[in-house]
Amino acid sequence: RRYDLDILRILLTVLVVLGHASYYTINTKFGGIHYDQILSDMMIQDAGVHKATSLLTEWIYSFHMPAYFCLSGAVFSLELKKNRYSSVSKLIREKAKRLLIPLLFVWFVWNIPIKMLAGYYDGLAHPLMMAVIQIIFPNAVYLWFLEALFFCFIMDYVIEKHIKNVGQQFIIVGTLALIGLGFYKYARQIVPFGNPFRWLIWFWTGHFIDDILNELSKTSENHGFKSKKRAFVAESFLFALLYEISFCTASVKWILINTVMPFVGIIWIWTFARIIESALKEEHHKKLLAISQNTYGVYLWAEPLNYLVLSCVMKWFGISVFGTEMGAALIYIVRVVGTVVISVLITNMLRKIRCPIKAY
C-alpha cells in the first residue's frame, strides 16, 4: 500500500478544513453570507486573528486543490496499470456511484437544510429551486470538486486510452486548461460542473508525479541535498519566494497562482508526505489507514457546518464578537474542531450501519 498517498490525503484534508474555517463572505447568484459587510456597516474593525487565518487560507488555496486533483490522478494511474476499468462505461458507473450519488445525497439531506437554517438563501424568491439549480453551477460550493473530478476521470481515461504520445496529451490538457482558466476568469458564476477543463491538467500530472519527484530527488542529491529534509527546506524557500513575488501585481499573482505556484506546492507537500512516511514505524500504519479512511467523510460533511456556526454566533452574541480577538479565535477553533468531530461521527455512523450510499 502507498502510505505516502494516505498521508497526503490526510494533509490535504487538514488544509481543506483550515481553508473553509476562515471565510466570512460567500457571494453567488444562488445565495451566500456577508458577515464582512455587516462588520463594515457597523464600523467594526476585523480582528487580527481573522486577518491572519484569511492569509493562511489564501496560501492554502494557492495549491491545495491542484494537489487534490494530482493525488486523484496518481491513484487513478495505479488503477489503470492494474486494468481496473475495462471500458469507459464501467468507469462512469463506478465513479458515479462513488462521487455523484454521494454528492446528491449530501447536497439534499445536509447542504441545503443547514444552509437554510444559516440564512444562506435569505432574500431569494425561490430558495429551494435555486439550491437545486446550484448543483449544475456549484461555484463557491465545496461539492464542486466531486463534479469536476468525475469529468476529469472520464476525460483522462479517454486521453490515456486513445493518445499514447505524452507530448500530444500535454497539448490537449494544456489547451483545455487555458479554456478552463478563461471560463474561471470571465464567467466563473455560470461555468457548469466545477469547471473540469481547468483542473484536468493537474489530474493528468498525477500520472507522472512519482517520476518527477524521483528525478528531482536525484537532481537534489547531485547538488548537495543529500536528504529529503534538505530538499524540502529548499522547496519551502522557493515556494515562499514565489508566494511573495505573487503580490507584485494582480496580473502576476493571477498567473503564478494558476501555473507555477500549484506545481511547486504539489512538489512541496508531496515531499513532506514522503518525509513523514519515512519517519513512521510499521505499527503506525494501521492508525494512519484509519485516519485516512475518514477523510472523504470529513470533506463531505464538515463544510456546511461553518455556516451554522457563524449564524449561531451572530444570533446569540451579535456581530461585535466577530471583531474581538478572543471571539474571532474561538469562532475559528470551533469551525475547525467542531466541524471535524461532527463529520467524523457522521462518517463512522454511516459506516457502522453500512449505508448503501457511500457518503463516507
Model-inferred region functions:
Residues 1-360:
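Alpha-helical transmembrane segments and their immediate juxtamembrane cytosolic regions
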